């Protein structure tokens, strides 16, 4: 399966049987190279990936400044140290799951809930970890 198929079929999927889906998603290498993304995923800046990777290595690094992605600032909320970063902006937010080689991004807006975004992103991330990726 291509990386784009993972994005299209597993991240941009129908979450609840009602046609709800993430606003944007991507699979990005630890070096910031985009492996695959939805058409709506923002253009990443190198310093944003550097900050995200540093927060995985040093949990709490992004808390004072916020998580920036494509120039959008998210307030960092509870995650899982070294594994998951979560952010909030208005009625939407972001979940980032770190695997051995990649970062799985999911961005949501209402009516999709934070829990639904977490489930979609972490399910694919956990699968990739199991596959050694």
From Swiss-Prot:
Keyword Phosphoprotein: yes
SUPFAM superfamilies assigned to the protein according to its UniProt record, in alphabetical order: Profilin (actin-binding protein)
Motif position, Involved in PIP2 interaction: 83-99
Post-translational modification as stated in the protein's UniProt record: Phosphorylated by MAP kinases.
Entry-linked SMART domains: PROF
Gene Ontology molecular function terms on file: actin monomer binding
Record-listed Phosphothreonine modification sites: 113
One Pfam entry name: Profilin
A Gene Ontology term for the protein's cellular component: cell cortex
InterPro entries: PFN, PFN_euk, PFN_sf, Profilin_CS
Cystine pairs: 13-117
Top-level division of the source organism's lineage: Eukaryota
Chief subcellular location: cytoplasm
Annotated keywords: Actin-binding, Allergen, Cytoplasm, Cytoskeleton, Disulfide bond, Phosphoprotein
Subcellular location as annotated: Cytoplasm, Cytoskeleton
Other information: The variability of the residues taking part of IgE-binding epitopes might be responsible of the difference in cross-reactivity among olive pollen cultivars, and between distantly related pollen species, leading to a variable range of allergy reactions among atopic patients.
Quaternary structure annotation from Swiss-Prot or TrEMBL: Occurs in many kinds of cells as a complex with monomeric actin in a 1:1 ratio.
Family the UniProt entry places it in: Belongs to the profilin family.
Role description: Binds to actin and affects the structure of the cytoskeleton. At high concentrations, profilin prevents the polymerization of actin, whereas it enhances it at low concentrations.
Protein name (Swiss-Prot/TrEMBL): Profilin-3
């Amino acid at each position: 399966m291509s990386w784009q198929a993972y994005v299209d079929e597993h991240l941009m999927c129908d979450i609840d049987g009602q046609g709800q889906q993430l606003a944007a998603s991507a699979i990005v290498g630890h070096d910031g190279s985009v492996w695959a993304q939805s058409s709506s995923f923002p253009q990443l800046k190198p310093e944003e990936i550097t900050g995200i990777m540093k927060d995985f290595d040093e949990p709490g690094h992004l808390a004072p400044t916020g998580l920036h992605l494509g120039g959008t600032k998210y307030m960092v909320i509870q995650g899982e140290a070294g594994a998951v970063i979560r952010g909030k902006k208005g009625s939407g937010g972001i979940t980032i799951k770190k695997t051995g080689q990649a970062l799985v991004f999911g961005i949501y807006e209402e009516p999709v809930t934070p829990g639904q975004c977490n489930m979609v992103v972490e399910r694919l991330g956990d699968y990739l970890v199991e596959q050694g990726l």
